[in-house]
Amino acid sequence: MARVVGSDPETDLAVLKVNLTGLPAITFTQSDKANVGDIVLAIGDPFGVGQTVTMGIISALGRTHLGINTFENFIQTDAAINPGNSGGPLVDANGNMIGINSAIYTRTGGSQGIGFAIPVSLVVQVMDQIIKHGSVIRGWMGVEVQDMTPELAESFKLKDTNGALIAGILKGGPADRAGIRPGDILVSVNDKNITDSSGLLNLIAMLVPGQTAQIKLLRNDKAMLAAVKVDTRPRIQQPLTDQ
């Protein structure tokens, strides 16, 4: 009998506890050392036919803007992933887990050679927090952001599309209290450069609530600094039952 310890709707991950002893455990590898072209195996129960292993390669790393989860940093693979594979491990050629199979891109309902897995580095972060706190605690600044398109970059007289445009500010929120305004372009958080809006959200989420983050931004063609006291990201409630 498995008991739900906690879940994280924003990454579509959950931690289960099984009250049995002597069970074998999979070993983790470091997903940040994975390379495009590495051989991987996807394990699951596609369409309920029974445990199945499919082989492929890593097609891409750091996939974002897929609209699957709030926080995205997917491994893309061409290993056949079908309904029933979600939640199963993606392992390297040595059998070490590199990710958890999450979703596929398909127009037919079956595999088309474009599957996505949550990297084990993110899995471990979420797992550790759920075991410790029962949920995932993330940083939050109260901003609505969007990517810098080539058109926006041109209108702001920028040389490239790096950074994230502040489209909205929550009144009274951390960013508002720090003086950040709609129309500002955030370019770094604690000296970590921002490439796009997804990268900014991921950086903010990793901040510890209560700490002060140093933000570099552009306003009216001028570089500015802002100190933002990070708050706790509001939780999304998604009840789970024991299975």
Each model region followed by its residue ranges:
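Short strand-turn-strand beta-turns centered on an Asx-Gly dipeptide
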Residues: 189-194, 220
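Conserved catalytic motifs of ABC-family nucleotide-binding domains
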Residues: 183
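Short beta-strands and strand-loop turn motifs
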Residues: 41, 186-187
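Serine-dependent protease modules
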Residues: 1-162, 167-171, 176-178, 197-212, ...
